[in-house]
Every structure is written in structure tokens, then in C-alpha cells.
């Protein structure tokens, strides 16, 4: 029997301090050469054990082998020059120096497949692997070749599909596409963003997910969120299109958020990764706070389709805080799972009593 309310993380977890400076995005590696290769494997083992000890059900790699959730993938592609950089506005809210697309993009070799094989050897639990989505990749580059966000996105979709198929062959059970750009460029999402995502999942023999959030707890994101008003209804613009898509699982943030949780109704029928852990604060949720968020979500999603998760990745947090939040996620899910199982037993007993009365 499949476990009810299986827990997972949205993506990144803090790296060990011997591998990279903690609590920092884009943190450079402290090791080189063969030491870095082995160090990354050791970090994968540590990340796995952190999740196992916390009782997380669906394991991720914690993004231990990458410096950034988007650019590490792009670094492995041809047609992109990391020395030729331009300043662009990422997610339409902050300036960043990014590499330039200078020619046709392609994937000469697999990017994360060896890492996935290694993680598969370490655990029998289900594995979810996150890779960037086509639109978010486009939004993290300067394009001097295709001169069209849509054309570049379609090329990335084909490349991501190649990578995803090999990840599945390596033993990955769920492929997650990270698309924070979906929360910003609504017209493009509906015109071609979801279609490109469908191209990326084409032919995959596994479950697929899309993660759409309001970002890490960094200043650029928290400042942006202050401009969004008392209700964050961005999901309302994109959920109807996603509801009709072939994506199996849709992720959204709910904990300590201004997102009206009833927006989940727009994607009823899909499996939902409900963000029940706030990654923008060092305050560790209580199990009851997590449980309260999950109970609210259950008004709009069937229990068998609810996947408790974190709002986003936790790279900027300390390992102690991240560990506490993982424990809270599991404990909160346990509370609600036990409530649901108790209700189910009561309903079964009630039915038995009714049948006995008839007989």
C-alpha cells in the first residue's frame, strides 16, 4: 500500500561546510579535482542521511553537486559562453550577470546522471530529482543567437527531455522541473511555457512534477514579495493551463504565505506538493503548524494526492535549522496521517455495524 502523505523537499539542502561556504548562494567549492569529486559524493551521502533520519519519504539529492539550481545545468551545455556575460533582469526583479547564448545549444554529455546512479545505489526509497524548467533557463541567460525566448525554450525542452529520460533509466522515480519564472511571466506561460514543459516530459516513464514558488529567502525575493499585496494570486494566472497539462504533480508554497490556499481548487485532480515549511525564516515550525497547513489543503485536494513539502530549497539556511524544519515536516505529516487513518478506521467500523444491523 502506498504511504499516505509522503514527504519530500522542494530541492536544495545546506551543503557541508567542508564542501562550500554555508548559508550562501553561488558558494564556490572548497575542494578541487579528485577531492571535489569524492567530496560531492560524500555530501550526497550526508544529505541522504539527513533526510532519512528526519523521516522524509521521497529522497532528493539536496543539490549537493551543484552551485546553483539553474546555471550548473547550463554549464554543461554547448552554445553558451560563460566568459561573455551580460547583465539582465532575472525574474523581472533583480539584475544579474549571466552567460550568453552564442550558438545552437546542445547537451554533449549527461549532466546529473552519474550523480543519480550513485544516489540510487545508496537507498531503496523513491527518488525525486529536480532540474530547471525551460522558461527559467531562458530567464537566466542572455540570448545572442536565437533572439527569441520561445525558440530558445523549445531547444532547452528537448535537451531537458534527453536528460530526464537518462535520469529515469538511472533509477529516478519523479522528475521535477523548477519553474519560478512561471510566477512572473504569465502571458508566456500560457502561450508557450506549459507547452515547452510538456515537451520536456514527453515519453517519460515516471511521475513528473513542476515546482513553482516565490523563491529562496534572499533579500531580492523578500523585497519583491512585499510589493505583491495582501494576497498573492499569481498561481491563479497559470493553474488553469497546468490543470489541463500532462504534468502529474504541481508544487506551490503555502506555509507563512499570502497565497490563498483555495487556489488549489484550480488544479483539483492533480497531485499537489503543498509547501508546509517556510524557507525564508530561521524559525522552525512546530509540528502542529505544519499539520494546520496540511488540514487546510485537504479541503481542496484528496488525501491520496497530497504530498507535504517545503516551500522552496533550503541552501541559504544553516544545517541545524534545515534539519529542524525537516523534522517538523515529518512530524506534522504524521499528525495528519494518523488523523486520516483514524477517521478511516471509524468509517469502516461504522459500515460494519450498519451491515450487521441489516443482517
Segments from the language model and where they lie:
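Domain-level signal for soluble alpha/beta catalytic cores
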Residues: 1-359
Amino acid at each position: 500500500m502506498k504511504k499516505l502523505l509522503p514527504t519530500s523537499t522542494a530541492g536544495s539542502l545546506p551543503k557541508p561546510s567542508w564542501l562550500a561556504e554555508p548559508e550562501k548562494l553561488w558558494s564556490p567549492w572548497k575542494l578541487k579535482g579528485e577531492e571535489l569529486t569524492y567530496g560531492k559524493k560524500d555530501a550526497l551521502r550526508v544529505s541522504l542521511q539527513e533526510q532519512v533520519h528526519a523521516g522524509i519519504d521521497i529522497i532528493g539529492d539536496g543539490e549537493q553537486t551543484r552551485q546553483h539550481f539553474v546555471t550548473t545545468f547550463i554549464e554543461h551545455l554547448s552554445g553558451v559562453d560563460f566568459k561573455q556575460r551580460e547583465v539582465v533582469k532575472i525574474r523581472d526583479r533583480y539584475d544579474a550577470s549571466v552567460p550568453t547564448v552564442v550558438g545552437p545549444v546542445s547537451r554533449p554529455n549527461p549532466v546529473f546522471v552519474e550523480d543519480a546512479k550513485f544516489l540510487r545505489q545508496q537507498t531503496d526509497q523513491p527518488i525525486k530529482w529536480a532540474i530547471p524548467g525551460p522558461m527559467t533557463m531562458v530567464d537566466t541567460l542572455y540570448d545572442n543567437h536565437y533572439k527569441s525566448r520561445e525558440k530558445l525554450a523549445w531547444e532547452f525542452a528537448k535537451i531537458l527531455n534527453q536528460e530526464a529520460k537518462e535520469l529515469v533509466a538511472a533509477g529516478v522515480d519523479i522528475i521535477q522541473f523548477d519553474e519560478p519564472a512561471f510566477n512572473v511571466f504569465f502571458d508566456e506561460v500560457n502561450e508557450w511555457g506549459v507547452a515547452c514543459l510538456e515537451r520536456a516530459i514527453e515519453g517519460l516513464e515516471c511521475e513528473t512534477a513542476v515546482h513553482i514558488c516565490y523563491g529562496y529567502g534572499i533579500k531580492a525575493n523578500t523585497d519583491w514579495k512585499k510589493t505583491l499585496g495582501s494576497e498573492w494570486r499569481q498561481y491563479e494566472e497559470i493553474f488553469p493551463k497546468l490543470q489541463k497539462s500532462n504534468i502529474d504533480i504541481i508544487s506551490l508554497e503555502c506555509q507563512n504565505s499570502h497565497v490563498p490556499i483555495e487556489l488549489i481548487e484550480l488544479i483539483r485532480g492533480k497531485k499537489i506538493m503543498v509547501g508546509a515549511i517556510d524557507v525564508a525564516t530561521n524559525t522552525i515550525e512546530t509540528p502542529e503548524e505544519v499539520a494546520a497547513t496540511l488540514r487546510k489543503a485537504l479541503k481542496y485536494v484528496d488525501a491520496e494526492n497530497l504530498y507535504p513539502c517545503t516551500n522552496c530549497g533550503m541552501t541559504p539556511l544553516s544545517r541545524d535549522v534545515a534539519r529542524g524544519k525537516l523534522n517538523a515536516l515529518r512530524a506534522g505529516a504524521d499528525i495528519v496521517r494518523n488523523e486520516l487513518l483514524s477517521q478511516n478506521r471509524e468509517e469502516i467500523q461504522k459500515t460494519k455495524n450498519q451491515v450487521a444491523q441489516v443482517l
